[in-house]
């Protein structure tokens, strides 16, 4: 791991802009260009939004976000203590189905999967949810 930036923040909708700026600044500092930075910021925003809205469901809580670089990969790790939910278990939406026939939701996870190269989830022994987003292609 080359460098790492960490943000601890209350899991509130009002803080999503702070999270986006933090990920953007961290990615840029770690050498990511505009395209990679944009993809990672949007994926992290979708992940954080899911934690706030679906994980904590309006209850107080925090999110810890770590942005690091390993070789040519930018890694964003989100940790929380919200209700466990594995976004990698959600099947992709049927994009051929008319909008009015689709179940609501699921597009954020779909976007996340397509914006980054890897999305992994696990629960730590301490009971934290850990979602890791990996985007490759940073210049050496």
Residue ranges: model-predicted function:
Residues 6-18:
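STAS-typified acidic loop motif
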Residues 17, 23-45, 49, 101-103:
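Conserved short strand/loop->alpha-helix "switch" segment adjacent to the catalytic nucleotide/phosphoryl-transfer site
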Residues 1-6, 52-140:
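Conserved beta-strand-loop-beta-strand hairpin that lines the nucleotide-binding pocket
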Residues 9-10, 34, 69:
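N-terminal hydrophobic alpha-helix used for membrane targeting or insertion
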